[in-house]
């Protein structure tokens, strides 16, 4: 999976199409990512005896990695990623302009 924690991505399909956000968590085995401010769901929280209150909680749910693209801030659009070797190290790069990603 070429998307990593901390990457800025844009949603390319679904109810949140066009929104951008940072990747909070990558679920590699499920091929999903959790993006900040995207795919917000309402969870019904049940109270327990240890001080956790009941109520409705809004939180981000995972979204399939095929529905997001890496966001290129310079060009203000999504781009595909690839891997290449520079100085013996494997680095990610944007396929649209061949810039490496730190």
Curated annotation (Swiss-Prot):
<dbReference type="InterPro" id="IPR014722">
    <property type="entry name" value="Rib_uL2_dom2"/>
</dbReference>
<dbReference type="GO" id="GO:1990904">
    <property type="term" value="C:ribonucleoprotein complex"/>
</dbReference>
<dbReference type="GO" id="GO:0019843">
    <property type="term" value="F:rRNA binding"/>
</dbReference>
<keyword id="KW-0687">Ribonucleoprotein</keyword>
<keyword id="KW-0689">Ribosomal protein</keyword>
<dbReference type="GO" id="GO:0005840">
    <property type="term" value="C:ribosome"/>
</dbReference>
<comment type="similarity">
    <text>Belongs to the universal ribosomal protein uL24 family.</text>
</comment>
<dbReference type="Pfam" id="PF00467">
    <property type="entry name" value="KOW"/>
</dbReference>
<dbReference type="InterPro" id="IPR003256">
    <property type="entry name" value="Ribosomal_uL24"/>
</dbReference>
<dbReference type="InterPro" id="IPR005824">
    <property type="entry name" value="KOW"/>
</dbReference>
<keyword id="KW-0694">RNA-binding</keyword>
<comment type="function">
    <text>One of the proteins that surrounds the polypeptide exit tunnel on the outside of the subunit.</text>
</comment>
<dbReference type="GO" id="GO:0006412">
    <property type="term" value="P:translation"/>
</dbReference>
<keyword id="KW-0699">rRNA-binding</keyword>
<comment type="function">
    <text>One of two assembly initiator proteins, it binds directly to the 5'-end of the 23S rRNA, where it nucleates assembly of the 50S subunit.</text>
</comment>
<dbReference type="GO" id="GO:0003735">
    <property type="term" value="F:structural constituent of ribosome"/>
</dbReference>
<dbReference type="InterPro" id="IPR008991">
    <property type="entry name" value="Translation_prot_SH3-like_sf"/>
</dbReference>
<dbReference type="Pfam" id="PF17136">
    <property type="entry name" value="ribosomal_L24"/>
</dbReference>
<comment type="subunit">
    <text>Part of the 50S ribosomal subunit.</text>
</comment>
<dbReference type="InterPro" id="IPR005825">
    <property type="entry name" value="Ribosomal_uL24_CS"/>
</dbReference>
<protein>
    <recommendedName>
        <fullName>Large ribosomal subunit protein uL24</fullName>
    </recommendedName>
</protein>
<dbReference type="InterPro" id="IPR041988">
    <property type="entry name" value="Ribosomal_uL24_KOW"/>
</dbReference>
